[in-house]
From Swiss-Prot:
Oligomer and partners: Identified in the spliceosome C complex.
Protein family per UniProt: Belongs to the cyclophilin-type PPIase family. PPIL1 subfamily.
A Pfam family annotated for this UniProt entry: WD40
Protein's recorded name: Peptidylprolyl isomerase domain and WD repeat-containing protein 1
Annotated SMART domains: WD40 (SM00320)
Biased composition (Basic and acidic residues): 17-30, 455-478
InterPro entries xrefs: Cyclophilin-like_dom_sf, Cyclophilin-type_PPIase_dom, Cyclophilin_A-like, WD40/YVTN_repeat-like_dom_sf, WD40_repeat_dom_sf, WD40_rpt
Enzyme Commission number(s): 5.2.1.8
Amino acid sequence: MAAESGSDFQQRRRRRRDPEEPEKTELSERELAVAVAVSQENDEENEERWVGPLPVEATLAKKRKVLEFERVYLDNLPSASMYERSYMHRDVITHVVCTKTDFIITASHDGHVKFWKKIEEGIEFVKHFRSHLGVIECIAVSSEGALFCSVGDDKAMKVFDVVNFDMINMLKLGYFPGQCEWIYCPGDAISSVAASEKSTGKIFIYDGRGDNQPLHIFDKLHTSPLTQIRLNPVYKAVVSSDKSGMIEYWTGPPHEYKFPKNVNWEYKTDTDLYEFAKCKAYPTSICFSPDGKKIATIGSDRKVRISKFLTGKLMRVFDESLSMFTELQQMRQQLPDMEFGRRMAVERELEKVDAVRLINIVFDETGHFVLYGTMLGIKVINVETNRCVRILGKQENIRVMQLALFQGIAKKHRAATTIEMKASENPVLQNIQADPTVVCTPFKKNRFYMFTKREPEDTKSADSDRDVFNEKPSKEEVMAATQAEGPKRVSDSAIIHTSMGDIHTKLFPVECPKTVENFCVHSRNGYYNGHTFHRIIKGFMIQTGDPTGTGMGGESIWGGEFEDEFHSTLRHDRPYTLSMANAGSNTNGSQFFITVVPTPWLDNKHTVFGRVTKGMEVVQRISNVKVNPKTDKPYEDVSIINITVK
């Protein structure tokens, strides 16, 4: 038997003298506090005495993570559920950025760039540039907000002085550019800017104020076309990514384009930077927290990843895939089923036209929250507590793509606000407050929208001025208006002759002229003759107007789709309402439906253009026919014989 040390012998004797502890099911708060204190003071002794967890530790509940001052941080973020204002471009808006010098810059698909100045409440227009002859591929603003650049498929880069809103340089690149980014920091001798070639992995570094000759070329850093280039101004490092999922760290001219020395890793195997390649995805958006320590990305697999910049280790992953939203809708309904289906169709179209690459992510000024657009609206995520704390624009009929966040006070005052001024009851000083604003671009719209802390005054009124018409109508719109002044093409009543009886309707040509014109011209031309009611849902509606009878066909009298015409006095507030069927916003063709119950959830989604005045019993009989439960198509065809327009 081995000899025992003195301390082992004393401990063994103590164990023998200790009485057997009674079983405890619960501990009082005082006992719990004392036990925790004793366990902390005598860690070494406890480790020798016990094998496994202490009884007190086993009863400790895991505390929920809380972000201190979260309410204060949220007070400085937009909170309105609906957008306050929207402004126009001539074409679909694709990009938006916000500068530290209180400017908002928007770019549209036709190569135009607009400068807007943030004021105390809202924004004001500053200047309009025809920047490129073709499509704008990417825009970027410098870290201090002094310089802005854009690249387009006209093989050119335009450089602007933001504060003086003037174009100061133009570079002829000689290749089709893909991405661009200012990679200099305040104090650097050269205002360097990076641009990538769209079809290869090459990165060219230029002097933004210089000539067309590149200062440096990265030709082996990436082997696939680049998807993002972003500067971390705190650590003076650049992060770039390509379509193969590879992510690289590098520096600009002051550090001779080498690997940054201030990061805490040397080999990628020590990081999670291969995560995208493992998932066969790539980043479509990259941004950094204000302190430079966090990096947020959105991937082509629709996952949001939050990582530590210095170590490259993953912190959080948020799944925003379509399958996740479908499961969420099934578990707990987020939207009405029809609206959810419409938004899912928009998401699939996003993927079809590769517009997912335009969705971006931004940090707030604290670095505790990220904001990005989803099919439910703009999500505000607390990355510390792993919770979605707010959704902006859930009620709106827009799919948010790019967004820019402004926080702070736009109007600069001559004197700084002192403690005495803050404590005073001066009403003028009390009016000086922050106006946090999210400026976002939607999918396939020529407007950009602003979410603030203020809800719009009246969204249902036709005279609501939250949508500002700051652009002149196009030539096509003028011609369409001129043609409408010719022979009368519309009427205020029609009779739909069906195989089950006649339906008399009243139309609204004043409130929705284009929709009524489309219906009347189609009816006069015999377009609807022989069309079946291809979709009938008992207790909801009957739908027709598709020449194919599948629900996928039909077009307008202009040979395509036309825009919605919502009016405050025309609602789905009663049965026997005529309304246009669509596949999303501004996709009206020839299909229409007649409701058999009030359907208020369809307001501002489908254009109401008529009411049934006689023949309600015919509509009811049609809605009660037997249908295929899977397709809602009647077993025996009910068809339109013809439509008489009075």
